Amino acid sequence: MTESVELMNKYGEPLRYDRNFTGPRQRDRSCTDVPCLLLFVLFLGGWAFIAQYAIRNGDLNKLLVPTDSFNRKCGMDSGVLNKKNLFFFDLNQCIDPLVPITGCDTPQVCVETCPRETFVWDTMKDKQSFAELHSRLICLSEEHKAQIRTKSDIQDAINQNQCARWYIKSAPFLKRCLFEFSQGVCDYIPSFLLNGGRSRRELHMLPGNATTEVQMQADVMYQKMTDAQALVVPQANGKQTPVDEEPIIQCKRRLNEAVIKEKMMQTDTRLAKLVGNMVAHFYNGTNDAQLLGEKIVEDLVNSWSIVLVACFCTLVASLIYIALMRWLSAPILWFSIFGVLIGLLVGIYFSVKQYIHWENTPTVPVHGLNLHSTVKNVLQNQNTWLYLSIFVGVCFVVILLLVIVLRKRIRIAIALTKEGSKAVSSVISTVFFPIFSWILFIAAIAFAIGVGLYLGSIGDPSFRMVRQLTKSGEVTTEDCVCEGPAINYTVGGSCKPEVFQQYCSVRLTSFFQNRNPCLNTTCSFDSINNPIEIKWAIFYNVFGFLWLSFFISAFSYMVLASTFARWYWTFKKRDVPYFTLTRAFFQTAVYHLGTVAFGSLILAIVRLIRLVLEYIHEKLKKYDNAVTRAILCCMRCFFWLLETFLKFLNRNAYIMCAIHGKNFCSSAADSFNLIMRNFLRVVTLDQVTDFLFFLSKLLLTAGAGASTYYFLDNNPSIIRLNYIAVPTTVVVIAAFLITSVFFGVYSTAVDTLFLCFLEDCERNDGSPEKPFFMSKQLMKILGKKNNLPPRQRRGK
């Protein structure tokens, strides 16, 4: 009792009854935190001004300038000043979804213009003269091309990847030379090049890798494609007979699009290699890792339909789970708890059984460097199962003790969860409201990235004199001498490409003035020197994204809080209006955007401080100073705790603002005092409900994963897989994300109803003048009841 009085004196008196109080339904609301809203609007106006300035003065071409195999920026670096386009020796290697991440594994060279004709060495070498062939060659450098004297030299240069084996009429796109196909060309390309199901071996049978097996087909292709290149616009005269009788629909739409789709469906791609490289970090045996990566990607490609169906079923199951919780909240939540406990018991039994089996069954370890051998050794080791059984047993005991100790609080949590399920089911549109937030988030991210890129392109480019690296990673050595205006140029120093190209060269002899251009030393693009005002604009853009993203999240939260509070403070639930979410949306948008802007501004400032600390931490990593590391660690920890606390405070402030319509500071103070006056209830019930929601998500996720695994394991004829665990893992991850969205709405509902419940307990006493708004179940658990005349009673 003394403790309650102390809390009451410290955090204010309990709320008093107000007969005019109607919660979010009150009509005498006024706009809150208007100055902060005006500040936010002005800030957005400044952001828009920066955006238009960046778009008008920025040039994304500076950031999208292609780089050749020698790390020279086409059209910018010395030696390639007049060569602004990038040519790929084998464009087939570049049509891959992961090329932006992994790069294009083919020689690339800067050219003045993209090739305007087709060249196929394997077909043309015996049909044209050396001079004609030499004129069509595209090589790594003009020096390589100048050293070619015969057709044999051409063959050697092509075999050594110094010159392109083949190319097709191309056009520049973002300064990259891409194939220029017209629809007429599609009629003349053999089907073996466009068959959607062709294998990797068939891919290597392109003109650039022609073999004896396809020499005849390559001849036909060259002849037909040479004739077809002129068909930029289909001719009006008689149509020639195509190579294939059936039309190639994908090619008709667009050949490049068809090739990209096909490449995305191939399994032996860079994605497989990337997965294989990731796996290779965990065990020895690179070849096996690459094979495993190929199989994993193959399973992902083949099982995408199963994954989508499983995700849809998870979504439906979550909705059914929500609907059932409205009437069967207690059984379902207890089932979730006991389901996890039973699952842990089964895990203990299986682990102990496996431990006893392998303890009594001596085995010889399989000596191998592949993954299969490693996994087999681990599973046949009795200690593995011993440690696993101990871990699962500890988890079982901890969860069981928590359930026993918190069983009384769990009853109240179940009642609150039931209230939340009623509220969500009553306004089912709240479940899909997060989609609105996602759309706004995506738009904010796209806008911030776009503005950032344009801002980053404003400024003068800086160049440095560098030496190229060999294939083995060693620095090249070259006697590159500069004179005249470039006499002070040094490796690593700044330079100008035009001056470098004119006054820097390799001295062949010390007695004669014979010089050649520097090949292994270049004046290369280093970075763009942004003016100081542009750097501040970039900082403004980063803060703008933080503020806007927190604003979107806060707005969404307040709309949901207003919806659920409106439901709670409606005495007769059948009187809840149909468009509750819509009314809450417009009420928040009209009256409380200033409060949303205020709360999001506070979080944005704290997050910006955290980002600055992370930046300082990265910069100071090279200085091994224990004191600096300790200070930074303490500051990072402090601001992380501060942001976590402010998020908690903001959420409750938004709820109180949605209920009472007060400004941010008043709402934050009221919610904080209300929580502190009921501190034990808040801590216990909040944690219990979070725990129950986590168990429910775990149950749905485990059910989705187990169902997927069981279906695939018992129906092998439906889909052919190497590892059933691959699609199962994807389904588990997707299911957890889906359930997190649904239970995120639930969490908002419970948080809102809980504050309403606490206020209801303080404001009302159950008399006819001051009836409780809580459900009968909650009143029964708390030992309270409404003393109402029969005609004033309501059904719960």
UniProtKB/Swiss-Prot annotation:
Transmembrane residue ranges: 35-55, 304-324, 332-352, 386-406, 431-451, 542-562, 585-605, 626-648, 691-711, 724-744
Glycosylation sites: 20, 209, 284, 488, 520
Coarse class of the protein's main subcellular location: membrane
Compartment list: Membrane
One GO MF term attached to the UniProt entry: transmembrane transporter activity
Membrane topology: Multi-pass membrane protein
InterPro entries recorded: Choline_transptr-like
GO annotation, cellular component aspect: membrane
Highest taxon of source: Eukaryota
Record-level GO BP terms: transmembrane transport
Keywords: Glycoprotein, Membrane, Transmembrane, Transmembrane helix
Matching Pfam families: Choline_transpo
Protein's name according to its UniProt entry: Choline transporter-like 2
Organism of derivation: Drosophila melanogaster
Gene name tied to this protein: Ctl2
